[in-house]
Design a protein with these regions (language model features):
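Structured soluble/peripheral alpha/beta segments that form catalytic or ligand/cofactor-binding pockets
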Residues: 21-374
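Fungal secretory targeting signals
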Residues: 1-21
Length: 374
């Protein structure tokens, strides 16, 4: 079976030279030696478009989606779902070499990870035959042919829908996220002329920093659903990822009327780059590259992290804003991914604003550790 929206995406005939309508085709395998142009300064439109034209051996674009359940009365129900659509050259997302030491099966890879309500994990990696990325307005849609997977974005970034039709892999269903807050770049709002680099060589744009998410899947005949806080962003790079990042912490969560996205990256020379985003209701409080400190706490909280560090108990996030000082804590309940070089967590999100308690919430966050130690 093919979802109607996937067929619609596949049938779009768009001009590759147009800013408003763009179509990019990525084959499963390509030579990769061609010179690539990477865009670092934002345009007035095309927010979620591919930023490498064409993709080559050292470049990458990925589109990421997640949702984590808002906790029940006991605060223990944290199922979650996350999915990433990767287009990458053989050396672009070089961290994949940890998983595929003999080489990538395709330049089009899809990762699906989830936690069941009891904390149990499931994971899939799917290799595509061809990727077709189309752009209308600010939104992007992608059909990763040969996987049964696609995503479809509204031109105004108000909503994204992800489709999975892979019964032979034991998973069929959809994920939908509707935005509640404005999009942003690392250092400012979504407007023309913004620097999209979060560190030299890696760009980031956050189309849906926080929204209402719904995931409904059938997994090996068993229903799986999540209702909670959803998210979508897009990363890209012009060189192997580990040449730009030594370690990184990123996450997002909501506390009452405040939505927060945090990011810190250390370069291989240990220069720290940060990004802070806070909204109150639908208004941006801060969107900037400063005023934030993110650190692990508890056991295994070595900073900067290494591949031998292990999983920390959680993270503290301090954000200085015009609203006041946010002192936040993300406490791990479930681990969604647990490799030595990459870990992803969900759990309780708590904190204060100028010392006054905020309503408890939920968050999802990650840790990269890309040192060369074995």
């Amino acid at each position: 079976m093919m979802f109607p929206s996937i067929a619609h995406i596949s049938s779009l005939a768009l001009l590759s030279t147009s800013v408003l309508s763009q179509r990019t085709v990525v084959p499963a395998h390509f030579d990769g030696t061609e010179q690539s142009h990477t865009q670092w300064i934002s345009n007035a439109t095309g927010f979620d478009a591919p930023m490498n034209q064409p993709l080559n051996d050292t470049s990458f674009d990925w589109w990421y989606f997640d949702v984590v359940q808002e906790p029940d009365a006991q605060g223990q129900d944290h199922p979650s779902f996350a999915m990433t659509f990767h287009t990458t050259g053989a050396d672009g997302m070089d961290v994949f070499q940890n998983l595929f030491p003999l080489g990538l099966p395709s330049n089009l890879l899809i990762q699906i990870n989830l936690n069941w309500p009891d904390g149990g994990k499931d994971a899939w990696v799917l290799a595509g035959d061809e990727g077709v990325i189309t752009v209308e307005g600010d939104g992007a849609s992608g059909d990763f042919r040969g996987t049964g997977c696609a995503f479809e974005g509204e031109a105004d970034l108000s909503e994204y829908v992800v489709y999975v039709d892979a019964p032979e892999k034991g998973i069929v269903g959809t994920f939908r996220v509707k935005s509640d807050v404005p999009p942003h770049y690392p250092c400012g709002p979504a407007e023309a002329g913004q620097d999209m680099q979060v560190v030299p060589g890696v760009g980031w744009m956050n189309a849906i920093p926080d929204g209402y998410g719904e995931a409904d899947f059938t997994i090996r005949g068993k229903p799986f659903s999540v209702r909670g806080r959803g998210y979508h962003d897009h990363n890209y790079g012009s060189r192997p990822f580990s040449q730009s990042a030594y370690s990184a912490y990123w996450g997002h969560g909501r506390l009452g009327e405040y939505a927060i996205v945090w990011l810190t990256v250390l370069t291989p020379t240990l220069e720290e780059h940060v990004s802070a985003y806070v909204t109150k209701g639908t208004e941006i409080v801060v969107a900037r590259c400063g005023g934030i400190t993110i650190r692990p706490y508890g056991a295994h909280s070595t900073y900067p992290p290494t591949r031998r560090t292990g999983a920390p108990e959680g993270f503290t996030i301090s954000v200085d804003t015009p609203e006041g000082l946010f002192e936040l804590q993300a406490e791990t309940i479930n681990t969604q991914i647990n490799f030595d070089f990459y870990r992803r967590f969900t759990g309780r999100f708590t904190g204060t604003l100028d010392g006054e308690p905020l309503p408890d919430g939920v968050a999802l966050w990650e840790q990269f550790a890309l040192d060369k130690d074995e």
